[in-house]
Amino acid sequence: MIKKILIIFLLFNLLNTAHASLKDEIILNLEKTNNLSFDFKQTIGEKIEEGNCIIEYPKKIYCSYNNLNKKIMVSNGKSLIIKNQMNNSYYYYLLKKTPLNLILDKKYLIDQIKKLEGKIVDNKYFNFTLINNENKINIFFDKQTLNLVGWQTEDIYQNLVITYIYKIKLNQKIDKNVFKLPQMN
């Protein structure tokens, strides 16, 4: 009986050590990441959108959508603008009022990951659930590459938004001008 308890205890400790090690490696990888560029697929309800983005920490993002409206999304770290280039309409948000404020804040992500227990999903991803005020964000990292591979949030209309990112490139030379907010006409 004591042998069984000892074996269970050792297996449990081994599993916890593996999770802790993976978590530490994810944190280290995030600390070394200054920017990332990627393609994405975003699902909001039945609607699927695709495109590409550049994130520069802290809190800057530029995304170009491959859709009929040729939508772009830009944050300069304070504001977030979504522009429909076909009809020239603009949507302006304070970044701090959106879940992207947290996702684009590398320091916040690292601080939260240090406090949280992650879980393995489909033996491929490591997931952390961040809760901040009214925002619940699931972030996913690839177990092999340790890279951020997506997130799940709710939009302002309480629709589930799932963003999967791929073809990820880290620490590329980027044009800082892409984070300038488009001028409203």
Where are the predicted features?
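Flexible, surface-exposed loop/linker segments and immediately adjacent secondary-structure boundaries
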Residues: 86-125
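An acidic-aromatic
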Residues: 53-102, 161
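Short hydrophobic/aromatic-rich beta-strand segments that constitute the beta-sheet cores
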Residues: 40, 61-65, 80-83, 128, ...
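Boundary at the C-terminal end of the N-terminal hydrophobic targeting segment
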Residues: 17-20
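Sec-dependent N-terminal signal peptides
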Residues: 5-14
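A short, Trp-centered hydrophobic/proline-enriched beta-strand micro-motif
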Residues: 28-48
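Gly/Pro-enriched, hydrophobic low-complexity segments
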Residues: 111-185
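Solvent-exposed strand-loop boundary residues in beta-sheet-rich modules
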Residues: 44-46, 86-88, 157
